[in-house]
Regions:
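Peptidoglycan-targeting cell-wall enzymes and recognition modules
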Residues: 2-22, 50-165
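Alpha-helical scaffolds flanking conserved acidic
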Residues: 4, 38-47, 178-185
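Amphipathic alpha-helical segments within well-ordered protein domains
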Residues: 11, 28-32, 164, 185, ...
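N-terminal carbohydrate-binding/catalytic regions of secreted carbohydrate-active enzymes
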Residues: 13-36, 40-43
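Short, mixed-charge amphipathic alpha-helical segments
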Residues: 29-37, 147-154, 176-179
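Short polybasic/polar patches that bind polyanions
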Residues: 32, 140, 168
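Acidic helix/loop microenvironments that form the catalytic cleft of cell-wall polysaccharide enzymes
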Residues: 49-53, 131, 176-195
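Extended serine/threonine-enriched, polar tracts that run as long, contiguous segments within proteins
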Residues: 159-173, 188
Length: 196
């Protein structure tokens, strides 16, 4: 049996969002196509994606870090003298993205091998899809280039669809059905970020 997501319920789940109508339309259109059609699955999907996107308000990753925050979050990408190096990058989001998301400096590769890829393929959408490889995979799924997909993901429908694509590729409906929030969170953000 399918669960109907009502607009007034969504408004309570994403407080402070001024675009509830557009989000409701996108969710109602896209979620069923990915089997996110039960109350439990929708609850997990909306809670995880609202955490990742600040209640559906932030569709692009904020990389405007101070030097201190930059070192705390991305210090390992700044070599032997991270403090001196990070000072050059602080408050320069494009420069930060091109450094920390460049495959040259990462153990976990993202497919970012061309100049500017870090910035072009920074986190976007409800899931904060990141890296040329992820945008290429999603783009193939929706018949777009990686570059087109990066733009699409910054729209409500594209943000929902890219999150659903990720959800589906990671088989998160199965985990939602077991109500394992910790396991799901680890798959989505690589750790336990956001868990109380």
């Amino acid at each position: 049996m399918s669960f109907e997501l009502k607009k007034e319920h969504l408004a309570k789940l994403i407080p402070g969002n001024k675009n509830v109508d557009a989000w409701h339309a996108a969710l109602v259109d896209v979620l069923p196509k990915y089997g996110i059609n039960t109350e439990r699955r929708m609850a997990h999907f909306i809670s995880q994606t609202s955490h990742e996107s600040n209640n559906f308000n932030s569709l692009e990753e904020n990389l405007n870090y101070s030097e201190k925050s930059l070192l705390a979050v991305f210090g390992r990408y700044f070599g032997a003298a991270p403090k001196a190096s990070a000072a050059e990058y602080a408050r320069n989001p494009e420069k930060i993205a091109n450094r920390v998301y460049n495959d040259e400096f990462r153990k976990y590769k993202m497919g970012n091998t061309k100049p500017g890829d870090g910035w072009r393929f920074r986190g976007r959408g409800l899931k904060q899809l990141t890296g040329r490889e992820n945008y290429t995979g999603f783009g193939k799924f929706v018949n777009m280039t990686a570059e087109q997909a990066a733009d699409y993901v910054a729209t409500p429908k594209g943000a929902v669809e890219s999150a659903c694509w990720f959800w589906d590729t990671k088989k998160l409906n199965n985990i939602a059905d077991t109500d394992d929030v910790t396991k799901m969170t680890k798959i989505i953000n690589g750790g336990n970020i956001g868990l109380a």
